[in-house]
């Protein structure tokens, strides 16, 4: 039986970045890795309602930098930046070096696989029908501009005695194309009938420039002004018609 490789792991160094960027001596590697896991676990619990998608950890010499990608930056920053300052102190205690926290806002959360999976899991825990939750997620993601999406849920769906797996797919999800920008995430929904697993694949287009384009993305182009009947243009046209009617009357 064929098995699928992790869509993000196979693309690391091709069109995907690692979630941790640092170098260490062989003796320090295990220590750094353990602290990274502790930081991720701490932030996941503390920022549970902040819609956090990704946590990037970097270790410049004698310091640490943590970049949090979230759809709700206001919850992380807090009033007048109080929460983020407290967060920096707590991360400094965990990592043992001065930690700097920066926020990366997610403009379109419907194109983020982790946030979509979280939304589906949250609905399942609130006893929303799994088919409705899946179809709603697929529609919202395709409406946001995705090229394709696949959603899969498995477990005792609808309280059934026997666990099963169901999935929906719309558009293209080319898992074998390495230049394809595939975002993948898994979540667990703890329901009264047991645990339901949620998997989401989102195809956001192809990255033709490789890692150079990922590390140095091109600035977003400004949209050209729409040509149409604006209020001023319409008034001007109506004015011209009025002038013509007045000329004919004369």
Curated annotation (Swiss-Prot):
Name the UniProt record assigns to this protein: Small ribosomal subunit protein uS3
Q: Which GO terms describe its molecular function?
A: mRNA binding; rRNA binding; structural constituent of ribosome
Subunit text: Part of the 30S ribosomal subunit. Forms a tight complex with proteins S10 and S14.
Biased composition annotated in UniProt, kind: Basic and acidic residues: 220-250
Question: What's the stated role of this polypeptide?
Answer: Binds the lower part of the 30S subunit head. Binds mRNA in the 70S ribosome, positioning it for translation.
| Disulfide bridge partners, by residue number | none
The cross-references to SMART domains, in alphabetical order and at most eight, read: KH
Any GO BP: translation
Entries under NCBIfam families matching the protein: rpsC_bact (TIGR01009)
Question: Which CDD domains does this UniProt record tie to the protein?
Answer: KH-II_30S_S3 (cd02412)
Please list the residue ranges annotated as the KH type-2 domain.
Answer: 39-107
- One Pfam family linked to the record: KH_2
What organism, scientifically named, is this protein from? Acinetobacter baumannii (strain SDF)
| Ranges where the record places region Disordered | 215-250
């Amino acid at each position: 039986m064929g098995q699928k490789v992790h869509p993000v792991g196979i693309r690391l160094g091709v069109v995907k970045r690692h979630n941790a960027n640092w170098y260490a001596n062989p003796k320090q590697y295990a220590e750094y890795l353990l602290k990274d896991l502790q930081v991720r676990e701490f932030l996941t619990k503390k920022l549970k309602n902040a819609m956090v998608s990704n946590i990037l950890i970097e270790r410049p010499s004698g310091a640490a930098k943590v970049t949090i990608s979230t759809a709700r930056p206001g919850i992380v920053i807090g009033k007048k930046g109080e929460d983020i300052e407290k967060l920096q102190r707590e991360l400094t205690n965990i990592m043992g070096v001065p930690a700097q926290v920066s926020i990366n806002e997610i403009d379109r959360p419907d194109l983020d696989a982790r946030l979509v999976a979280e939304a589906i899991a949250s609905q399942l825990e609130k006893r929303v029908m799994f088919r409705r939750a899946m179809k709603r997620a697929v529609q919202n993601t395709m409406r946001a501009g995705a090229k394709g999406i696949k959603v899969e849920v498995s477990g005792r769906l609808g309280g059934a005695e026997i666990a099963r797996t169901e999935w929906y797919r719309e558009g293209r999800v080319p898992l074998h194309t390495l230049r394809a920008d595939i975002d993948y995430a898994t979540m667990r929904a703890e329901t009264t009938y047991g645990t339901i697993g949620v998997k989401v694949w989102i195809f956001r287009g192809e990255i033709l420039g490789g890692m150079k384009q990922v590390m140095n993305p091109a600035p977003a182009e400004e949209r050209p002004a729409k040509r149409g009947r604006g209020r001023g243009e319409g008034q001007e046209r109506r004015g011209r018609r009025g002038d013509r009617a007045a000329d004919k009357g004369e």
